[in-house]
Amino acid sequence: MFKKVLRLVVLCSLFPLPFSLLPGCGPFWVDPYITVQESSLNWVVIHYYNMSRQPIRRIGVEIYGNGLVVVKKGTSELVSNDFAKRNKDESWDNIKTSRLQIDPANVTGIFQNLVNNGLLDREKTFKASKKESQTRFIAVKANINNNTYSDNVNMFEEDPDLAEHLLDVVREFEQPSR
């Protein structure tokens, strides 16, 4: 009798185990070419470095779904890393920051263009024709409609077509006309 009760208790305790794993699972076939919805929770951060010059010229562009655009330029590590530690470096204070407010509908258009060019398509990124090492570096991190991309790779080497679209966005805000 005791063995039957013990067996029943063990079976009852193991029964929910497979179901406990299901909530963390999600479909891996989610379409990366989504229609971007206007949301203040969407954002894209692009870091561009021109390594053909010394010191390295850096540009950071942060675009938020509410229309805020933050552009950082200079040779300081602070352009791409808010937590940089080398404050004794001679280029530490070589940073200029500007903030722009644009129409959120225009931001949604920028995000949609990047999505249409494969920003969220992980398969495209790693299967694209790769180029040799570049003297330019561009990386992107994004959250668009709760779809994220945050691999810190040089897009000029991984996906040159997307890299050119990212560079176009950087150039659009690098020298804004007011």
Predicted feature descriptions by range:
Residues G65-G67, T75, L114, I144, ...:
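A mature extracytoplasmic/lumenal domain signature
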Residues G65-N66, L100-V107, A142-N147:
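A short, structured loop/turn motif at beta-sheet edges
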